[in-house]
Amino acid sequence: AKVLIDSNSLGRLINMKGVYGKSQMISFNQTDWRTNREASGGGILLDQGIHMLDLMRYLSGENFTEVFSIIDNAFWNFDVEDNAYVLMKSPKGLVSQLHSSATQWRHVFNLEITLERGSLILGGLLTGSKSYGDETLTIITSDPSKDNGMPKESTSKYNEDVSWDNEI
């Protein structure tokens, strides 16, 4: 995805929308450090959502300077948020939204990146539990004057996590 974005083959970035959600706050144990604001500093946004935010910043090369958010403790009643809704804008005008959730019920990792001549969709996440589904990259190439809402797309599936091999 980074290579495609940096190549400018699909044009400039228009927006990004990411969802990183899981079904609980790691455990139902009220004494878990992740559910204690004093120990963790925050809830699902700092625990999981920060990884989506880092990915958005990495792929776009942008820092977000305008940030609006709503955090909520909609279900778990812990000392930290179980949902965070974040709307961001960079100095160059890139608008991005992020939803980090511990009430997703079905684990989800999805990042949609809209560019001038297409979109990229990163889906799934290779984890030990396999609960986030297959890791995929969908490339959509669009010509709005001809596609009539049905652009060409191709999806690649990734079966091996080499991220630890690439760590410094």
For each feature predicted by the language model, list its residue ranges.
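Predominantly a Rossmann-like dinucleotide-binding segment in NAD(P)-dependent oxidoreductases
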Residues: 1-77
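NAD(P)-dinucleotide binding in Rossmann-like oxidoreductases
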Residues: 76-81, 91-167
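Membrane-targeting and insertion segments and their boundary/processing signals
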Residues: 23-30, 83, 142-146
